């Protein structure tokens, strides 16, 4: 499946999610938090309005951590702002902060963040550029996590490892948004994957497409009770 997904933050200002939905957008990834203290002032409103528009909704955190302990603290802060949220798309950690350029291997930091999300029962994915995935986030220990890759100006990403979403433009024009937005394509049926695995504190809905253990394993989950 190929579905259109936007990532939305306070930068977009007022968003008419009903018009966004009518323009063919399937889901939105909403910026929730950054660092250990920043909560996006637009997150709650964007969440409520996106749900009312019947969009699939996920959330992301902009990582500032430079150590494993800081990553865990940021993940817990992120989680604290997601209580009672019905999220049918992944929780993403956005790794691209300028201060992280000097860190050669970000894998332990990324893994610590995602492990914290998974221990809390959520579906985790890592967002970054293809360049960073090839260099700073290339360690095998991250292969058990899903990826949301970013590369603009190409017909196909220059990346060989599996990924679930590809952000292909930072200049999408979508009805309901003043100005530009980042647009991705989702290749996976995240709502079904997440519900069937009992993640994001969601319960399976019937009827639902049956999901195989092999498909779940391909997403990085080695032991899942169906």
List PLM regions with ranges.
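Functionally critical loop-and-helix segments that line ligand-binding/catalytic clefts
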Residues: 1-11, 140-208
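Short Gly/Pro-enriched loop/turn and capping motifs at secondary-structure junctions
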Residues: 98-100, 131-134, 152-156, 170-173, ...
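Substrate-binding cleft of extracellular glycoside hydrolase catalytic domains
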Residues: 1-22, 26, 30-123
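Short, low-complexity, charged amphipathic interaction modules
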Residues: 202-226
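Aromatic-lined carbohydrate-recognition surfaces of secreted/lumenal glycan-active proteins
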Residues: 121-134
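Short beta-strand/turn micro-motifs composed of small residues
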Residues: 61, 128, 151
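Structural recognition of alpha->loop->beta junctions
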Residues: 79-93, 97-99, 136-163
């Amino acid at each position: 499946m190929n579905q259109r997904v936007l990532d939305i933050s306070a930068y977009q200002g007022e968003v008419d999610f009903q018009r966004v939905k009518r323009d063919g957008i399937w889901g939105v990834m909403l910026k929730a938090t950054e660092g250990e203290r920043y909560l996006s002032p637009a997150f709650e409103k964007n969440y409520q309005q996106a749900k009312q528009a019947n969009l699939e909704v996920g959330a992301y955190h902009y990582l500032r951590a430079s150590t494993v302990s800081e990553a865990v603290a940021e993940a817990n802060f992120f989680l604290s702002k997601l209580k009672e949220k019905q999220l049918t798309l992944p929780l993403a950690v956005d790794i691209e902060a300028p201060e992280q350029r000097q860190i050669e291997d970000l894998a332990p930091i990324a893994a610590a963040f995602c492990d914290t999300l998974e221990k809390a029962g959520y579906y985790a994915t890592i967002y970054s550029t293809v360049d960073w995935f090839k260099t700073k986030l290339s360690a095998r220990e991250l292969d058990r996590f899903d990826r949301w890759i970013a590369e603009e100006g190409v017909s196909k990403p220059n990346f060989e490892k599996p990924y679930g979403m590809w952000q292909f433009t930072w200049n999408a024009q979508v009805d309901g948004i003043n100005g530009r937005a980042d647009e991705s394509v989702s290749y996976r049926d995240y709502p079904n994957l997440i519900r069937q695995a009992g993640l994001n504190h969601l319960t399976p809905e019937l009827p639902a497409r049956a999901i195989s253990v092999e498909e779940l394993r391909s997403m990085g989950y080695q032991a899942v009770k169906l």
